[in-house]
């Protein structure tokens, strides 16, 4: 690696962060400022300068996707190699959970101890802990509160008082949750099992309690890098502190304006206290935004009013942000549909996304777009599965694949990721001899995957959109009760809602459209305070005009297009009806991809339908589906 080449394409602020002294450093990196680039270039530059030993580097982030992206970038910079089976001289890059699990594995191997089993089905374990008092569908709410308590290092005995102080308002009484929490911890102890956050607690305790283990761990890891540090919770921070001991070689990157996970235990105060913890660290900023036009960034800054933001757009001036007021949620859907249809006409490069505060808002929009034949990028299976397969491709040896699959099955609560892990295990069993690596496994996985819709309108919650960017973003539900959400009660929660709106706005690179409905569910609404007294960068419109162009006369759709839309709508109605009867999600009955194939092929026999759905599903749903396909061809 040539150190000068690493700095060649960085701006002055980025270069200052990459080349600062190897002591405690905190970088405030705004949206679109190139923070991951700075972090990876910092690691590469330190190694190139000889001030960091790659085998002693520990880089921690919050998702396996982010860790995989960091590895990819470091490999492109020449730091990691894809053709090396021996990774002992490579940086360690992972999530808090994966690093904790790796340390516990090493500890168990060194002491010939048994590594505790990780709970596979937490809901079932909670039900068993409560016996006749099990909570049924409310178990999810209880487990969410237990996760919050773990993240904040709150014991069952202190839960009720701490949750009350934090003004937590779960669907179940706090005293009931405290009882359930106590029972859950007791049954875990009785059965010798742990859950994910226990891994971090156990690793932290092992370092703090065992001098020999602490010395070995701190000998191994000497240079610390943390991404997205604004999302740290107290438990994760205690783990980081145990890992580093009294070392000052720590490089922290975060954006306080993107701290949006307080509901699950993250505490922005952790990031705010870092200067005091590290003792006179170097504090730097990355103020340049290379993503958003000046107009988009001006509105995002307005949304974050009350917060002093040192950010500036490095983009050329763009089009005004558009604020559209409509009568109700049905007109809101119509505005989104018209915008999406325009986008279909020009293609999906650049990208287009609809963002909402809650998933519930997105469901009718998705149905409307699908019924009108507008492609919708699969929100369920494709993203997590694709990311997991990309991670598999990074594995260099059979051992790497085995460890990756075990980690996912231990760590992940996502069904698609766990399916990929099980498929990797099946692949390894079927390839018991010969050389096996991640690339061959990834080829196998992709070949066995039905291709989901990859191009189309993306529908995401504000939380789900974090870390993403799109050319055109439409934000729906710009009303009080959604922005900010009605569940926000404390000043801290309201501040987080403001940051969440800021995150949503800064997903847009070129075009931002904000839609407000005057009525929702038959009730009058109040405009979101975030979009009151809008700056000059905003153009107000009514529902009669779409944001990018006014309606114009076009030729009527071809009869075949109309027939396809009608069949798609009726198949969706069939799917929804069966799903309601079976108390399940519509996609569990028929996937969007299967409906698209039925619309395209128009099967008229059970045998033809079976080639799409398989014989079992075809036999179960055949009568209802074939009735619709017959009607569409008559």
Regions found by a protein language model. Name each.
Residues 21, 88-90, 109-197, 221, ...:
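ATP-hydrolysis module of ASCE/P-loop NTPase motor domains
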Residues 223, 368, 385-541:
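Conserved helicase C-terminal RecA-like lobe
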Residues 83-103, 121, 372-395:
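Conserved beta-strand -> loop -> alpha-helix junction used to position metal-binding or nucleic-acid-contacting
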Residues 1-112, 215, 298-301, 506:
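P-loop NTPase Walker
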């Amino acid at each position: 690696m040539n150190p000068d080449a690493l700095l060649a394409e960085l701006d002055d602020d980025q270069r200052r962060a990459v080349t600062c002294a190897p002591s405690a450093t905190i970088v405030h990196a705004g949206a679109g400022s190139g923070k991951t680039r700075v972090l990876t270039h910092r690691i590469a530059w330190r190694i190139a300068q000889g001030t960091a030993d790659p085998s002693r580097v520990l880089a921690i982030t919050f998702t396996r996707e982010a860790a995989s992206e960091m590895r990819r970038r470091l490999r492109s910079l020449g730091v990691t190699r894809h053709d090396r089976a021996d990774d002992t001289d490579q940086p360690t890059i992972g999530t808090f959970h994966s690093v904790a699990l790796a340390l516990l594995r090493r500890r168990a191997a060194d002491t010939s101890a048994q590594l505790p089993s990780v709970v596979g089905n937490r809901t079932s374990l909670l039900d068993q802990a409560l016996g006749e008092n099990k909570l049924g569908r409310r178990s999810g709410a209880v487990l969410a509160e237990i996760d919050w308590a773990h993240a904040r290092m709150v014991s069952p005995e202190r839960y009720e008082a701490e949750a009350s102080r934090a003004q937590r308002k779960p669907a179940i009484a706090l005293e009931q949750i405290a009882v359930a929490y106590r029972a859950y911890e007791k049954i875990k102890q009785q059965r010798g099992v742990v859950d994910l956050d226990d891994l971090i607690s156990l690793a932290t305790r092992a370092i703090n309690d065992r001098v020999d283990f602490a010395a070995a761990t701190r000998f191994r890891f000497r240079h610390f890098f943390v991404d997205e540090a604004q999302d740290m919770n107290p438990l994760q921070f205690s783990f980081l502190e145990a890992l580093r001991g009294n070392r000052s070689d720590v490089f922290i990157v975060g954006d306080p304006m993107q701290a949006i996970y307080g509901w699950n235990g993250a505490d922005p105060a952790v990031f705010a206290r870092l200067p005091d913890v590290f003792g006179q660290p170097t504090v730097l900023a990355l103020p340049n935004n290379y993503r958003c036009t000046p107009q988009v960034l001006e509105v995002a800054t307005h949304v974050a009013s009350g917060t002093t933001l040192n950010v500036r757009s490095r983009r050329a001036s763009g089009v005004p942000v558009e604020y559209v007021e409509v009568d109700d949620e049905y007109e809101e859907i119509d505005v989104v549909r018209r915008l999406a249809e325009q986008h279909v006409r020009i293609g999906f490069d650049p990208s287009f996304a609809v963002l909402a505060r809650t998933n519930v808002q997105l469901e009718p929009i998705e149905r409307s777009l699908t019924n009108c034949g507008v492609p919708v990028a699969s929100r369920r299976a494709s993203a997590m599965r694709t990311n997991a397969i990309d991670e598999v491709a990074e594995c260099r040896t059979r051992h790497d694949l085995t460890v990756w699959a075990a980690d996912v099955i231990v760590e992940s609560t996502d069904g698609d990721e766990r399916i990929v892990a099980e498929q990797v295990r099946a692949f390894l069993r079927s390839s018991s001899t010969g050389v096996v690596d991640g690339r061959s496994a990834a080829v196998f996985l992709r070949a066995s995957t039905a291709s989901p819709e990859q191009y189309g309108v993306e529908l995401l919650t504000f939380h789900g959109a974090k870390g993403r960017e799109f050319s055109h973003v439409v934000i729906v539900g710009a009303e009080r009760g959604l922005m900010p959400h009605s569940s926000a009660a404390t000043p801290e929660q309201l501040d987080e809602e403001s940051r969440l709106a800021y995150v949503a706005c800064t997903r847009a690179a070129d075009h931002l459209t904000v839609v407000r409905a005057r009525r929702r569910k038959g009730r009058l609404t109040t405009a979101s305070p975030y979009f009151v007294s809008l700056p000059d960068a905003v153009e107000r419109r009514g529902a009669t005009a779409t944001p990018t162009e006014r309606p114009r006369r076009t030729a009527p759709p071809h009869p075949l297009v109309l027939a396809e839309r009608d069949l798609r709508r009726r198949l969706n109605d069939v799917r929804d009806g069966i799903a309601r009867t079976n108390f399940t999600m519509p996609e569990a009955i028929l996937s969007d991809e299967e409906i698209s194939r039925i619309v395209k092929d128009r099967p008229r026999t059970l045998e033809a339908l079976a080639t799409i759905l398989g014989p079992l599903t075809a036999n179960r749903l055949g009568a209802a589906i074939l009735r619709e396909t017959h009607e569409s061809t008559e």
